[in-house]
Amino acid sequence: MKVRASVKKMCDDCKVVKRKGIVRVICKVKKHKQRQG
């Protein structure tokens, strides 16, 4: 899980989702998991 100021899709499988006001990136590639913070 990377915590970043700006979350971006890193590949075509990445999805940007908003959960409880937190922007997250979910992906089958574990290295691509991110959240905004």
Curated annotation (Swiss-Prot):
Keyword Aminoacyl-tRNA synthetase in annotation: no
Pfam families on file: Ribosomal_L36 (PF00444)
Keywords: Ribonucleoprotein, Ribosomal protein
Disulfides per UniProt: none
InterPro entries (UniProt xref): Ribosomal_bL36, Ribosomal_bL36_sp
Gene Ontology biological process terms in this record: translation
GO cellular component: cytoplasm; ribonucleoprotein complex; ribosome
PANTHER family xref list: 50S RIBOSOMAL PROTEIN L36, CHLOROPLASTIC, LARGE RIBOSOMAL SUBUNIT PROTEIN BL36C
Family to which the UniProt record says this protein belongs: Belongs to the bacterial ribosomal protein bL36 family.
UniProt protein name: Large ribosomal subunit protein bL36
